[in-house]
């Protein structure tokens, strides 16, 4: 699959939804990795691609995606997916990081945005925007400390932004590519 969401750690991860080759049909398949092998688990409710993920294999979260561009949020409790409150801004190709009760959604598209939202386990709240609006970026970290980096602003960028609570986005650097 391509354009799927991922969450978890090296020895316990989920690969969620995306497009199936060769037809690029949307998939609601979810697979779990145990550090050695992959196995299929309960399907997600909404089949979309290019969404972001946060959390663990027992307390996970996926959000955003396309087509169509959506604000959809679903949480995972280790055995089933549940619809949650939507992002305030529908988008795909965004970065996500954190845990199920403190996650961040940053950037995205298809209209390139700097929008950043924080999830508290129940709802999304708009917080400080990225310094560099972009989509197709990556992110990692906890809800209180993380990074977003790379992506496209219309052309590729190596911009890296550090997230810290309570100060929000700070310490913008541009790494060499």
Descriptions of predicted regions:
Residues 1-177:
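Polar, enzyme-active/binding microenvironments
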């Amino acid at each position: 699959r391509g354009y799927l969401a991922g969450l978890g750690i090296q020895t316990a991860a989920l690969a969620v939804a995306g497009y199936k080759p060769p037809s690029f049909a949307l998939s609601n398949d979810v697979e779990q990795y145990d550090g050695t092998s992959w196995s299929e688990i309960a399907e997600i409710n909404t089949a979309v691609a290019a969404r972001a993920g946060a959390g663990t294999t027992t307390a996970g979260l996926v959000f955003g995606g396309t087509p169509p561009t959506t604000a959809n949020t679903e949480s995972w409790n280790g055995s089933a997916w549940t619809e949650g409150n939507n992002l305030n801004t529908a988008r795909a190709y965004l970065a996500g990081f954190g845990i199920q009760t403190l996650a961040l959604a940053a950037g995205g598209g298809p209209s390139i945005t700097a929008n950043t939202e924080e999830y508290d386990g129940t709802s999304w709240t708009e917080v400080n925007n990225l310094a560099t609006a972009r989509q197709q970026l990556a992110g990692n970290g906890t809800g209180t400390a993380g990074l977003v980096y790379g992506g496209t602003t219309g052309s590729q960028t190596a911009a890296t932004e550090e997230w810290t609570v309570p100060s929000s986005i700070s310490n913008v650097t541009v790494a060499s590519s």
